[in-house]
């Protein structure tokens, strides 16, 4: 009788966020609210199909593009459109070739690819995540061997960003530090920087 190679593999701990969803599904209270996974639900409790997504799906289906392998960086036209959306079509960042864009498998997958790349470039650096942050971010960067620390971000008293403390934290970091910023929909607080604060941050 052979023993399975996986016989002694221990079960990983259950994901706490997905566990909240399981508890939500089991809850009988009709007024319950799901504050677990960061997914938008309509008033009917269902995930809506956004009109823009439906339109994009229909346009792609109508065009019937080839189904071969994509270039390593992904679809060039899509990457260019993303750069134009983020930086502006006439941005010098785009025009001078300083923006690099490639497609990845979702948000966490993209972070892992970035973490591996940064580990090869800056192996001795520390990664800084916001306080608080989504805990998976810490685990992801620690898994590739980075030391992970935090920078000041949220102020519970104002329920917003403590921008002065955040700027002080960033200014005190050593050279070649790696800072993980949430561009929007900060996880888990929902507190985002204003356009003026982003511009101020660029100069640190």
What do the PLM-derived regions correspond to, one by one?
Residues 36-39, 179-185:
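Short loop/turn segments at strand-loop or loop-helix junctions that form parts
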Residues 193-199:
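Charged helix-capping and loop-helix junction motifs
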Residues 19, 81, 110-114, 165, ...:
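Well-ordered alpha-helical segments embedded in enzymatic catalytic cores
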Residues 202-204:
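Conserved small/polar residues in nucleotide/adenosyl-binding loops
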């Amino acid at each position: 009788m052979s023993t399975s190679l996986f016989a002694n593999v221990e079960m990983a701990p259950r994901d706490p966020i997905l566990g909240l969803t399981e508890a939500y599904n089991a809850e009988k209270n009709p007024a319950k609210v799901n504050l677990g996974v960061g997914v938008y639900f309509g008033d009917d409790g269902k995930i809506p199909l956004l009109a823009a997504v439906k339109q994009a799906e229909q346009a792609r289906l109508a065009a019937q593009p080839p189904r071969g392998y994509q270039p390593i960086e992904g679809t060039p036209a899509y990457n260019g459109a993303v750069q134009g959306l983020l930086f502006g079509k006439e941005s010098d960042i785009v025009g001078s070739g300083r923006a690099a864009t490639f497609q990845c498998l979702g948000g966490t997958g993209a972070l892992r690819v970035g973490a591996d790349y940064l580990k090869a470039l800056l192996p001795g650096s520390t990664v800084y995540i916001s306080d608080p942050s989504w805990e998976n971010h810490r685990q992801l960067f620690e898994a590739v061997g980075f030391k992970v620390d935090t920078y000041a971000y949220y102020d519970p008293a104002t329920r917003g960003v403590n921008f002065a403390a955040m700027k002080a934290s960033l200014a005190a970091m050593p050279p070649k530090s790696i800072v993980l910023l949430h561009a929007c929909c900060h996880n888990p607080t929902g507190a985002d920087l204003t356009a003026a604060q982003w511009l101020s941050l660029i100069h640190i």
